[in-house]
Amino acid sequence: MKSTLIAFSCFLFPTAIVLAQPKVENLGNAINSEYNEINPVISPDGKTLYFGRVSHPQNAHGQEGSQDIWFSEWQNSQWSLAKRMTPPLNKEEYNCAYSVTPDGNTLLIMGAYDRGAYETRGFSFSKRTVNGWSAPSKLNIPGLEGMSKGEYMCGFLSNDGKTLLMAFSEKKRSTKDDLYVSFLQKNGTWTKPQSLGVEVNTDDFTETTPFLASDGATIYFSSDRPGGQGSNDIYYTKRIDKTWKRWSKPANLGPAINTDGYDAYYAIAAAGDYAYMVSKKNTLGKGDIVRIKIKSDEPSAAPIVPAPDPVALVSGKVVDTKTGKPIDARIIYENLADGTEVGTAQTDPRTGEYKIVLPKGVKYGVRAVAKDFIAEAQSIDLTNMKGGFQEVNGTNLTLVPIEINAVGVLNNLFFDTGKAALRPESNAELDRMVLTFNENPGLVMEIGGHTDNVGTDAANLKLSQERADSVREYFIGKGIEPDRVQSKGYGEAKPKATNDTEEGRQTNRRVEFKILKK
């Protein structure tokens, strides 16, 4: 039976999911207790679990129906003892985390807050700082307050931070929610929510607790539509195009996941190996959080339930090229084919570490952005990514301080072999440097071309000069004054690595910038 105990705008499910095969694992007393654990939110790297705990004596409002956000971390092959999140979070009677970004530094939480003070229903971000989590700050979503008239509301933020899924009803006091989407705009506001359409939403039944998989295209949600195993089942649908209006027919995940009870809040990490849910069966108290093995350890085996497209989890660190120290920076990743920004992330302000999730099939440029620095971008090519989920570790990003004689590499420049003409996928890197020139009107640079030692000295010197000239001409064509950009070819005279290996030769084939004035 579905419980009627409801958080202010986040579901409480004391009567939760009864999970069947295969391999259901109760997460144990480090996470579960005699109280009700609900609404699991797993970080994309699978290492942090946020969840709600109901009526616990440590909750901000004690044991009378309160709900606070708790978390546990995966350490030494086990979950750590769960801790309650401290102020400025968990100040209200009912608190809920909906999702966390891949970098682990931004939480999407229930309620619209202004400088930490609750205003109304909606959504807010809390961001990690060197001193802990920030006071929550509301997302500006035009039309949401007037559209959301039902009893419930919940949401989910995409891994790239640009898409917000929401479940709510436009009918007053209705419990039959539909799914909506809103998109982040360049000015920091969000678009008016738009319905996912009749292929997903129904008139007489509910669609709720959306979870957008790491591929950015597969949505899992809960619905009480006919044909399910119980009162509510988990369904999935896949986006067909970029309009967010065309979807595959929603399919039930079947008895491997769904039960004869109320099934909701389905969540999976980027690796796609486990699903996290809530169970009422064989629990330590009321509802417990469990995980279900949904991907076989055998690579050739079919998944137990339909899986999203594989992705890569990319991690690294942002450091100052001069000092080697970590930097608190914004991460931007873009499609090198057309220069479009795919998503953003934030480094851990304490360590400079970052994590992003990248869908396969694209060649990406990744860079860090911080005041008074110029980025050395990196490229990550997933166009021919084979197999399933991959981890790409050690993709460190460097920032060059804007100081006289500082030198950096323009990594995402592309030329055909032996040619000096810039290929179109170089534009994003070059446009970024144009922006740096415009933001620093006193900046003067030398663009230096370098080659490996294949070929004659004269040919390499000529090619390096022509490539440096091509970059200079691009900048001038974008409005940068000619006397602010010099170009010089060095040929093979200044190698950074050995020329005895292909990897070393590739490192030596480069275009650098050197700051002459600032």
Enumerate the language-model features and the residues they cover.
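Periplasmic OmpA-like peptidoglycan-binding domain that tethers envelope proteins to the cell wall
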Residues: 66, 223, 228-230, 440, ...
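Short, ordered, surface-exposed loop/turn motifs in non-cytosolic proteins
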Residues: 176, 321-337
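A short, amphipathic beta-strand motif
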Residues: 312-321, 331, 352, 397
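Short, acidic Ser/Thr/Gly-rich low-complexity loop/linker segments typical of extracellular
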Residues: 337-353
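Short, conserved micro-motifs composed of acidic
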Residues: 21-315, 392
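Structured interaction patches on ligand/partner-binding surfaces of diverse proteins
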Residues: 371-396
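A short, solvent-exposed beta-strand micro-motif common in secreted/extracellular proteins
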Residues: 352, 362-372
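Short, solvent-exposed beta-strand/turn patches at coil↔beta or beta↔helix junctions
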Residues: 36, 402-443, 451-459
